[in-house]
């Protein structure tokens, strides 16, 4: 098996897909895959057993939906361009505009698709501003005070995205704001898309609450088709990134295990969010605890503490995270396994510094490993053309 490697576990993927399909059936809604979180098209035959559509935010994603998933996309983009718009329309069943000006500019060229408008309820509980689509000054969506009383006759739906790995309780509170702001326009619509961020495959997610919410919404607005488009929920906890220790260095009492992967290149959300990924067989140590462990006066200060910062193999100074405490001394060549590394990774990786890209594999239910993709010098060179 080539390493480093992202490994998708088919059994876990099917578990998520079955849960999502069950929610869609019980709640009488459509749940579609957001490519921005996961777009490994060689897995699409499995997805098509459970869902029928996907969502795209660019021409490339719309083409992937149409050509590889086999169905036109539900497409939304912050801004369409003249050069790409017609081809996007040809690959889409639904097309949502981010602003009234974009609608006015392009809607006459969107014949044959169901047109939507993104709205902003000015409410979101996402704490990290980088991921909050409703933060003050946002570029996303139209607020209620800017909508005409009567919508243009070809607008068929509203799109509203307010969540990031959120629970059903958050959706319930958000839904109240959406209805308060926009319900008076619902009689003019055919569908509403509540966006992504509904992490229904997380263990503590209240699936039954979500189903009740959607059933209640249907009772109030029986003519509206409801769409959810999560991304992470599909690939949540479906596989790791397997790396290896290539060197161990020490400075000022801090030991760093340098790996053959990069946080910057291969796990960018860890630095952007930021968040500490789970490492198999290791415990995340908070900064204060880490300082105490490294203190000369600490009873735990000894080689047996096995405390390491993990460093990436790019030349970016900040390409590291830590600390983690292991139950043994790390050795050169030893595996370091980052859990839950299938969503928002392969769609965001890069080849900064020419760093080698991990392979991508699938562990099938029968225990056989299939290598879906390996990367080499040609991939780097071709990006530099």
Language-model features, listed with the residues they occupy:
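N-terminal capping/small domains of soluble enzymes
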Residues: 1-69, 262, 326-339, 343-345
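Structured core elements
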Residues: 96, 116-118, 159, 193, ...
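Charged (often Lys/Glu-rich) extended helix/loop segments that serve as interaction or gating elements
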Residues: 230-294, 299-385
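Glycine-rich beta-strand-to-loop/alpha-helix junction loops that act as flexible
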Residues: 161-163, 192-201, 230-233
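Conserved, mostly hydrophobic/aromatic
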Residues: 13, 36, 65, 117, ...
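Short glycine/threonine-rich loop-to-helix capping motif typified by GTGT followed
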Residues: 167-173, 201-210, 237-243, 247, ...
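Feature marks short, surface-exposed loop/turn motifs that line or immediately flank catalytic pockets
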Residues: 123-125, 164, 200, 234, ...
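Active-site-proximal beta-alpha core segment in soluble small-molecule metabolic enzymes
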Residues: 29-191, 205, 213-216
């Amino acid at each position: 098996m080539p390493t480093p490697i992202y490994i998708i576990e088919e059994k876990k993927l099917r578990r998520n897909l079955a849960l999502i399909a069950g929610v869609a059936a019980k709640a009488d809604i459509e749940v579609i895959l957001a490519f921005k979180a996961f777009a490994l098209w060689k897995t699409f035959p499995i997805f098509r057993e459970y869902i029928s559509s996907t969502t795209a935010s660019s021409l490339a994603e719309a083409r992937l939906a149409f050509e590889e998933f086999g169905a036109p996309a539900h497409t939304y983009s912050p801004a369409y361009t003249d050069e790409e718009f017609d081809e996007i329309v040809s690959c889409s069943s639904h097309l949502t505009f981010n602003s009234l000006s974009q609608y006015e500019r392009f809607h006459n060229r969107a014949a044959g698709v169901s047109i939507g408008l993104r709205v902003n309820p000015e409410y979101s509980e996402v704490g990290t501003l980088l991921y909050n689509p409703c933060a003050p000054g946002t570029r996303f969506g139209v607020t209620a005070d800017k909508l005409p009383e009567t919508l243009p006759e070809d607008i068929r739906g509203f799109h509203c995205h307010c969540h990031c790995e959120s629970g059903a309780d958050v959706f319930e509170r958000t839904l109240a704001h959406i209805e308060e702001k926009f319900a008076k326009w619902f009689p003019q619509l055919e569908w509403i898309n509540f966006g992504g961020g509904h992490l229904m495959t997380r263990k503590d997610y209240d699936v039954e609450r979500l189903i009740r919410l959607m059933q209640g919404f249907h009772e109030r607005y029986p003519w509206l088709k409801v769409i959810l488009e999560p991304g992470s929920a599909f690939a949540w906890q479906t596989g790791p990134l397997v790396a290896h220790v290539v060197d161990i260095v020490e400075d000022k009492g801090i030991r760093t295990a340098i790996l053959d992967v990069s946080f910057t290149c291969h796990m960018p959300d860890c630095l952007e969010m930021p968040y500490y990924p789970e490492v198999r067989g290791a415990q995340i140590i908070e900064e204060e605890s880490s300082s105490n462990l490294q203190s000369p006066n600490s009873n735990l200060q000894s080689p047996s503490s096995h405390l390491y910062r993990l460093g990436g193999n790019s030349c970016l100074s900040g390409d590291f995270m830590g600390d983690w405490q292991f139950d043994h001394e790390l050795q050169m060549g030893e595996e370091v396994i980052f859990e839950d590394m299938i969503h928002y990774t392969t769609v965001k990786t890069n080849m900064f510094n020419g760093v080698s890209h991990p392979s991508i594999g699938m562990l099938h239910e029968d225990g056989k490993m299939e290598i879906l993709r390996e990367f080499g010098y040609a991939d780097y060179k071709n990006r530099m053309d």
